[in-house]
């Protein structure tokens, strides 16, 4: 056997072994959380997998449909990527200095949801984000949107924090609930849990009225998020859902010019900038 054949055989063996050693993503998920299975199973043929992208393929095979199909379905099997239904949860929360129950699916058909995760109570960047969202809550309310903050702390910790004055590092009264993810199952289901630390990254998800995740960002622990950008993204999302034949260019804000997703019609936008 030639050296090239031996090398090729060894490479094939290593690749085959590496596939055996890879852990299943589903083993990392909470057993209490269910997800929509959008793509074929791993045993499907490559042709079957390709057929899973039929919604994307229509963008090139059907010109008339392409102008109305710019909200693609995610092809994720496990993690709640954009385009998938948000994992449902029910948990205790603190609102108006009382303990309440929050169930995500109860907002379906009623409101958009801004769901954001933060690492821990009584920390440093976290209160600046939480109070910033609270101070702008009326603006979100006008957009038919609920805000939910989530951390792995208990409801007792949440309560103590809202009962602490802002000038002392507390939150004061908030205009939206703080959810307790003390079992860490919610953070895990949304893919933001740091396993070896047991806390969540700064994940933020915009969920539409159908319960579908339309936007997500995940910041590392030391980087705070922008309420302005969250608001702008929410407004852009609502605009394109109300105007499915249009898309929003970079930095778009309400009242600014949108774009027709068509090679000819888009020239109207580009000629005006």
Curated annotation (Swiss-Prot):
EC identifiers of the protein: 1.11.1.24
Pfam families for this protein: 1-cysPrx_C, AhpC-TSA
Keyword NAD: no
UniProt keyword annotation of Oxidoreductase present: yes
Active-site residue numbers: 126
UniProt GO cellular component terms: apoplast; chloroplast; chloroplast stroma; plasma membrane; stromule
Record SUPFAM superfamilies: Thioredoxin-like
Transit peptide region: 1-72
Chief site of localization: plastid
Gene Ontology biological process: cell redox homeostasis; response to cold
Induction behaviour: Down-regulated by ascorbate.
Compartmental location: Plastid, Chloroplast
Residue intervals of the Thioredoxin domain: 80-239
Reaction(s) the record says it catalyses: a hydroperoxide + [thioredoxin]-dithiol = an alcohol + [thioredoxin]-disulfide + H2O
UniProt-recorded Gene Ontology molecular function terms: peroxiredoxin activity; thioredoxin-dependent peroxiredoxin activity
Family as reported in the entry's similarity comment: Belongs to the peroxiredoxin family. AhpC/Prx1 subfamily.
Binding partners and assembly: Homodimer; disulfide-linked, upon oxidation. Interacts with the plastidial thioredoxin CDSP32. Interacts with the plastidial NADPH-dependent thioredoxin reductase ANTR-C.
The protein's role, per its UniProt record: Thiol-specific peroxidase that catalyzes the reduction of hydrogen peroxide and organic hydroperoxides to water and alcohols, respectively. Plays a role in cell protection against oxidative stress by detoxifying peroxides. May be an antioxidant enzyme particularly in the developing shoot and photosynthesizing leaf.
Other observations noted: The active site is a conserved redox-active cysteine residue, the peroxidatic cysteine (C(P)), which makes the nucleophilic attack on the peroxide substrate. The peroxide oxidizes the C(P)-SH to cysteine sulfenic acid (C(P)-SOH), which then reacts with another cysteine residue, the resolving cysteine (C(R)), to form a disulfide bridge. The disulfide is subsequently reduced by an appropriate electron donor to complete the catalytic cycle. In this typical 2-Cys peroxiredoxin, C(R) is provided by the other dimeric subunit to form an intersubunit disulfide.
Protein name: 2-Cys peroxiredoxin BAS1-like, chloroplastic
Protein species of origin: Arabidopsis thaliana
């Amino acid at each position: 056997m030639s050296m090239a054949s031996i090398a090729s055989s060894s490479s094939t063996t290593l690749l085959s072994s590496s596939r055996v050693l890879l852990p299943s993503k589903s083993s990392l998920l909470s057993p209490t959380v269910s997800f929509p299975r959008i793509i074929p199973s791993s045993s499907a043929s490559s042709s079957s997998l390709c057929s899973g992208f039929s919604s994307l393929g229509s963008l090139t095979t059907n010109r008339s449909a392409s102008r109305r199909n710019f909200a693609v379905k995610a092809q994720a099997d496990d993690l709640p990527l954009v385009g998938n239904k948000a994992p449902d949860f029910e948990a205790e929360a603190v609102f108006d200095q009382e303990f309440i129950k929050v169930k995500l699916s109860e907002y379906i058909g009623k409101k958009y949801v801004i769901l954001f995760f933060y690492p821990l109570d009584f920390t440093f960047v976290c209160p600046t984000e939480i109070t910033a969202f609270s101070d702008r809550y009326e603006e979100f309310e006008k957009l038919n949107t609920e805000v939910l903050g989530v951390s792995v702390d208990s409801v007792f910790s949440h309560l103590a924090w809202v009962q602490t004055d802002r000038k002392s590092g507390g939150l004061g009264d908030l205009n939206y609930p703080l959810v307790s993810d003390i079992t860490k199952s919610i953070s895990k289901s949304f893919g933001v849990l740091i396993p070896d630390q047991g806390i969540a990254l700064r994940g933020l998800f915009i969920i539409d009225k159908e319960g579908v995740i339309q936007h997500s960002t995940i910041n590392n622990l030391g980087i705070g998020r922008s309420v302005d950008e969250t608001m702008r993204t929410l407004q852009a999302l609502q605009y394109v859902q109300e105007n499915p034949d249009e898309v929003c260019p970079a930095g778009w804000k309400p009242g600014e010019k949108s774009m027709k997703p068509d090679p000819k019609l888009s020239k109207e936008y580009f000629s005006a900038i």
